[in-house]
């Protein structure tokens, strides 16, 4: 009996020790403009981190930057407080990651949407143009006016990459289609300006577009309001946004930031972290389009079938999607 009790105590202590070790793994998440409630890019990152907290037992703290000057001090604060992994969400954090990672070489860092070459930094990159191509094809197959729209957030190469892929996919289906494109601004505020998103979308709808794809962070929510007013279709981005305006969000271009964030946390915690670039595309479902109970009645089966055929052709290399980064 005593031997059994000693064994039970040993197992219990071992369990507590293991739980403590896991709980001691600390992750600091620095979100971009718009914050975790943007229902898009940041929301996806936050979802991946909270899933890691739930499943892996990590300690998680997130902060929302109010302007670009805040990124570096926020990251440095995490590093100084002995966080094991610090994740920056968005290309605007590239310079901050470069500086802080160099100052704390024993810490692990990750960044979404920017390439930082350092042994302790993982760059999480996505083939947005591939996903946008499929979305463009879906928009063109659904349009009855021969005009579709694109509302981008900040006018930067990343969003131009979305736009280029979107237009190429639309023209694959209808070479004569007109693609209207506008951007919400040239500063970080462009990601969190729903009134501007709505203004641009209304103008595009009133110019004849009947489907609009948004790649604008929280500003895209304004475009969804415009879709509701005009009773036209909009397309979401990054997270599955079909639920936000049921019957009006035709689909969403999924960019699995949540998956990338979860994976890098898991690898860092388990001692398998390596620096370098990890890319996510159609082949590994890093980008895709959404189908669920909110859009299955408006996203026609014939459209889905053709979209899936195009996905297969891209993965097989039969279609090479134009890439703004390589133009």
Question: Where on the chain are the PLM-derived regions?
Answer:
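Positively charged n-region of N-terminal signal peptides that target proteins for export
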Residues: 1-6
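Bacterial N-terminal signal peptides
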Residues: 8-19
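A residue-level marker of the well-folded mature domains of exported/periplasmic proteins
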Residues: 23-327
């Amino acid at each position: 009996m005593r031997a059994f009790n000693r064994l039970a105590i040993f197992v219990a202590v071992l369990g507590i020790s293991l739980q403590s070790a896991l709980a001691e793994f600390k992750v600091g998440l620095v979100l971009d403009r718009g914050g975790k409630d943007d229902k898009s890019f940041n929301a996806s990152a936050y979802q991946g981190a909270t899933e890691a907290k739930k499943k892996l037992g990590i300690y998680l703290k997130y902060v929302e930057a109010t302007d670009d000057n805040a990124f570096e001090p926020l990251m440095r604060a995490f590093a100084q407080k002995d966080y094991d992994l610090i994740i920056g969400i968005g290309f605007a954090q590239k310079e901050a990651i470069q500086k802080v990672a160099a100052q704390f070489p024993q810490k692990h860092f990750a960044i979404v949407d920017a390439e930082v070459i350092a042994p302790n930094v993982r760059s999480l990159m996505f083939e947005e143009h591939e996903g946008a191509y499929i979305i463009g094809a879906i928009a063109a197959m659904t349009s009855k006016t021969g005009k579709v729209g694109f509302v981008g957030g900040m006018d930067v190469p990343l969003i131009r990459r979305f736009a280029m892929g979107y237009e190429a996919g639309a023209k694959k289906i209808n070479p004569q289609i007109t693609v209207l494109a506008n951007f919400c601004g040239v500063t970080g505020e462009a990601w969190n300006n729903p009134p501007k998103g709505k203004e641009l979308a209304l103008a595009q709808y009133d110019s004849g577009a009947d489907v609009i794809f948004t790649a604008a962070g929280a500003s895209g929510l304004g475009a969804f309001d415009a879709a509701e007013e005009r009773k036209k279709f909009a397309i979401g981005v990054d997270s599955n946004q079909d639920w936000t305006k049921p019957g009006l969000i035709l689909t969403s271009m999924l960019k699995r930031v949540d998956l990338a964030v979860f994976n890098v946390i898991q690898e860092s915690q388990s001692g398998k972290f390596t620096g370098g670039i990890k890319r996510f595309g159609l082949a590994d479902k890093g980008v895709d389009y959404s189908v669920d109970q909110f859009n299955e009645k408006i996203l026609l089966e014939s459209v889905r079938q053709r979209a899936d055929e195009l996905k297969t052709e891209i993965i097989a290399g039969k279609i090479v999607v134009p890439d703004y980064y390589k133009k």
